[in-house]
Amino acid sequence: MQIIFVSNYINHHQLPFCRAMLSQNDGEFIFIQMEPMEQERIEMGWGLDVKELPFVHCYNEEPEFCQNLIDQGEIVIYGGVEEESYITPRIEAGKLTFRYSERIYKEGQWKFVSPRGLKKKYHDHIRYRKKDVYLLCAGAYVASDFHLIHAYPDKMYAWGYFPEFREYRVDELMDFKDKEEKIEILWAGRMIDWKHPDDAIHAVADLLKRKNQVHLTMAGGGVMEAQLKQLTVELGIEKSVTFTGFLSPSEIRIKMLAADIFLFTSDYREGWGAVLNEAMNSGCAVIASSGIGAVPYLLQHGKNGMVYRNGNVKEMKEYVSQLAEDRNTCRRLGMNAYETIRTKWNADTAASNLLRVIRSIQTENPEAAPDGPASRAEIIAPGKGYAYTRK
């Protein structure tokens, strides 16, 4: 079959899924890049040379060719693009289409009552509820957002982002982490308010009052970086914290391999959070906020990670202290996290599951995957994600 994947731009989070589709699909697969990557993302090491990827076509270079593929392609996956006019003719014509989307109410579901917002949601989504269009939910709370506006009834599937899976022997993976006596804690991302990097620093400051053998690496940069460095000085922990600046994706993976604990402190504005996939793949014991879109899909509290209630820094600190004192639990959580990515939440599984779903829809017998990518998206309200990880 012919599959056209349309998104804002190709990056290292999309590339493994594209390669899996190229490998598994028995027909043509094309990725259409709709816009150049932002400079900030390029500086973060996200840039790829599209000229080295023959399946990628850039809309700004081949507009007529690309638009024809969007209009006439057998199956189109469309997401990450704000402008709706590119896809509207296709949906109105009743051609099989998959939208993929992060949350539409990241700032809070109370916003769905806005008349102006509802008008746009009707135009973009609700009016197509009976058309041949399905939703791939890139985050556990996406289905809840769209359920509020009665869009995509019984046509929503669990989805996400699928960074490169790297295979390791479990003993090899744990050996990386046993090279240092100190407990190594890693935080990685843009240093902006809704990612709450200061929570990681406060947690380690509390831990250092009781345990000397701890080190925190803050990987990334952003508007809060200077403020965070000053905070470590004020708390007297600057010798125990290293700021690396932005690192390439490969360099981040190296840091993850060495880390015992990965702290993921974002709130509900983190639509997915692909660093979670990467940290789990690297065998880290993850401590993550329940507000992060990927968390209810990927983590089971106490089995393959620790999940604290969004905004509850006290609970997060308790988990940091608990794991810092118990390396065996760190290793158990890390090994189970690795297995979650190896067996379920990876690009190959996502491609295989989605292709089966597409074929089932084409034969007018829609059937979701039993679990993981392309399974039925449960309606998980944002306030229920914490409990969901404890099922």
Task: Specify the residue positions occupied by each region the protein language model found.
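Membrane-proximal helix-turn-helix segments that form the acceptor-binding/catalytic region
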Residues: 115-135, 144, 148-149
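Short hydrophobic beta-strand element within catalytic cores of glycosyltransferases
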Residues: 285-289, 299
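Short alpha-helical donor nucleotide-sugar binding micro-motif in glycosyltransferases
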Residues: 246-247, 254-259
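Conserved donor-binding/catalytic core segment of Leloir-type glycosyltransferases
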Residues: 176-195, 201-204, 217
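Nucleotide-activated donor-binding/catalytic signature segment of Leloir-type glycosyltransferases, i.e.
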Residues: 53, 229-247
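A short, well-ordered alpha-helix in the C-terminal region of glycosyltransferases
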Residues: 315, 322, 329-343, 350, ...
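Acidic donor-binding loop of glycosyltransferase active sites
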Residues: 257-271, 284
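Conserved acidic donor-binding segment of nucleotide-sugar-dependent glycosyltransferases
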Residues: 300-302, 306-313, 321-327
